[in-house]
Regions:
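Class I S-adenosyl-L-methionine
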Residues: 1-166
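Polybasic, glycine- and aromatic-enriched phosphate-binding surface used to engage nucleic acids
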Residues: 132-212, 216-218
Length: 221
């Protein structure tokens, strides 16, 4: 599930798994969707399922070719699965009584919020601004790099990482926020302050808004 597809201000993509016992009403509802007519989990994934209500999708799939149906009851053991299993999984799927059904669903959510919509446009304490002497360090952290490294055991390898936008664009949702936000590191957001035009990190209230909380949520006084 991609958070920006459902009106959030983060480009945050996460995999969610919802499981339940076969003695529950959820199980009864799910098995009823695997009827003789459909022979797959399309109704459950797109209309009746737990995620379909919380994160609705369109009735048409993204690509008719991106549909997978697998019956693990046709395999004798895990070795047989390893030797014969060939299938692709997509952004939605369900497993019911050994049968897997997966498809590429199209989110039917809301337009994402943009980072610029939650940014404070006013007087900001100078402690949030990036000092001139730190600018090159920030550029290095955000930039692409390839570094030859050697582990403690003597194993040599190449460490590489791609670039991150610096500063973060205000006309897009923000990147995934980590717990290290606000510190001097590669993952912290750095924006152009709307009022001064100078680079700064996010304010606590801006971080609250990015995570879906009201302003002042973390203010303990």
């Amino acid at each position: 599930i991609y958070a920006a597809d459902y009106g959030c201000v983060q480009r945050r993509r996460r995999t969610f798994i919802f499981a339940f016992k076969n003695t529950t009403k959820q199980y009864e509802r799910m098995t009823s969707c695997f009827s003789a007519d459909t022979k797959d989990g399309r109704v459950w994934l797109m209309q009746e399922g737990f995620f379909a209500h919380a994160f609705p999708v369109h009735s048409e799939v993204a690509d008719p070719k991106k549909v997978t149906t697998v019956d693990f009851n046709e395999y004798t053991d895990t070795v047989d699965v390893t030797n014969r299993f060939r299938a692709a999984f997509y952004n939605s799927g369900v497993l019911c009584n050994g049968k897997i059904f997966s498809l590429e669903a199209v989110p039917n959510g809301k337009e994402p919020m943009l980072l610029g919509e939650i940014v404070v446009n006013g007087d900001i304490d100078k402690s949030f601004f990036i000092e001139d002497e730190d600018l090159e360090k920030w550029k290095y952290m955000k930039g692409a790099k390839t570094i030859e490294r050697t582990s403690k055991t003597g194993y040599s390898y190449t460490f590489s990482e791609g670039p991150i936008a610096f500063p973060d664009p205000l006309d897009r949702p923000g990147r995934t926020m980590l717990t290290s936000e606000g510190t001097k590191n590669r993952s912290s957001h750095a924006i152009t302050d709307p009022k001064t035009g100078k680079l700064r990190i996010l304010l606590p209230e801006e971080c609250e808004r990015m995570n879906g909380f009201p302003t002042g949520w973390t203010d303990t006084g």
